[in-house]
């Protein structure tokens, strides 16, 4: 595709089954195989291919996607999305005053398929996956980051809230050391 993502699928080919990881359920602190890699549901053709429920990607490919977003639609010097589309999709599409307090985006806005930072977190866009994965771009500090895990439910550990904070803290600490 135009972003150079060569390991992203709706159905993982048999040739790549060895690269899949097992997804685990966490029950009372014990990891139990939920979707073993060798017989994963992602080896089957989906009933309907859509990214929010079944797009499988490698960390390298996902990073290319984040790089493209951070470049406002440009990757490797080539425009693959209009800047307007990226800004619209990574901007808050919710009307002012919408209460998100009892949702999975509590305290944030919502873009085209992702969480949008507001207030002190303005300039961030990203999303967490069902199996604990989290990825985001931070336009203010021109940074992208991702963390890949394979456990469910995704809220077993506080990674979704803590990972972005840890990344920013490390960036700020690095700037102090460099100064």
Model-derived features: positions:
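Short, surface-exposed loop or secondary-structure junction motifs
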Residues: 1-122
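Structured C-terminal helix/loop/strand segments within mature extracytoplasmic catalytic/sensor domains
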Residues: 124-179
């Amino acid at each position: 595709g135009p972003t150079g993502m060569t390991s992203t699928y709706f159905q993982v080919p048999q040739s790549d089954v060895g690269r899949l990881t097992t997804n685990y359920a966490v029950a009372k602190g014990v990891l139990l195989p939920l979707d073993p890699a060798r017989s994963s549901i992602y080896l089957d053709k989906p009933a309907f291919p859509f990214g929010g429920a079944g797009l499988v990607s490698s960390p390298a490919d996902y990073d290319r996607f984040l790089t493209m977003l951070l470049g406002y639609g440009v990757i490797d010097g080539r425009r693959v999305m209009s800047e307007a589309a990226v800004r619209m999709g990574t901007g808050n599409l919710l009307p002012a005053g919408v209460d998100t307090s009892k949702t999975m985006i509590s305290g944030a806005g919502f873009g085209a398929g992702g969480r949008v930072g507001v207030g002190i977190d303005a300039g961030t866009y990203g999303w967490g996956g069902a199996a604990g994965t989290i990825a985001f771009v931070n336009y203010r500090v021109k940074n992208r980051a991702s963390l890949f895990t394979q456990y469910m439910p995704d809220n077993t550990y506080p990674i979704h809230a803590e990972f972005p904070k840890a990344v920013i803290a490390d960036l700020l600490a690095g700037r102090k050391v460099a100064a």
